[in-house]
Amino acid sequence: MAEEAQVIACHTVQEWNEKFQKAKDSGKLIVIDFTASWCGPCRVITPYVSELAKKFPHVAFFKVDVDDLKDVAEEYKVEAMPSFVILKEGQEVERIVGARKDELLHKIAVHAPITA
């Protein structure tokens, strides 16, 4: 049975580097959810992001707490939470700021359509 898709939470820079590199090497579309424990809208959208991970198992979803991984947040110039950065072949192709569910779904579907 296939492993159920999930959001990969990274808490250290080493963990981020290893898991992110593995996802890049796989060629998957990557969605990074930049969040913070104190961010109300982040908590609201978290269950939705988990549902998207199940709906799009061919996409790598990451959750990055900006307080835990400040360097990663700075690298991607994250200034507000939640922010979603979508990468294709290692390059940023989309950025969504705010808990905008419809836009997030649309942008993922454009770059990683579900093939039945």
Curated annotation (Swiss-Prot):
Q: Which UniProt keywords apply?
A: Cytoplasm, Disulfide bond, Electron transport, Redox-active center, Transport
The protein's matches in InterPro entries, at most eight in alphabetical order, are given as: Thioredoxin-like_sf (IPR036249), Thioredoxin_CS (IPR017937), Thioredoxin_domain (IPR013766), Thioredoxin_H-type-like (IPR050620)
Q: Which Gene3D superfamilies match?
A: Glutaredoxin (3.40.30.10)
What GO cellular component entries does it have? Answer: cytoplasm
The annotated site for Deprotonates C-terminal active site Cys falls at D33
What range(s) does the Thioredoxin domain occupy? 2-115
- Pfam families named in the record: Thioredoxin (PF00085)
Query: What residues correspond to the site Contributes to redox potential value?
Result: G40, P41
Q: Where in the cell is it found?
A: Cytoplasm
**Entry annotation: catalytic residues:** C39, C42
* Record keyword DNA-binding present: no
Query: Known PROSITE patterns for this protein?
Result: THIOREDOXIN_1, THIOREDOXIN_2
Q: List the disulfide bonds.
A: C39-C42
Provide the function of this protein. Participates in various redox reactions through the reversible oxidation of the active center dithiol to a disulfide. The H form is known to activate a number of cytosolic enzymes.
Q: Which family does it belong to?
A: Belongs to the thioredoxin family. Plant H-type subfamily.
Per its record, how is this protein called by name? Thioredoxin H-type
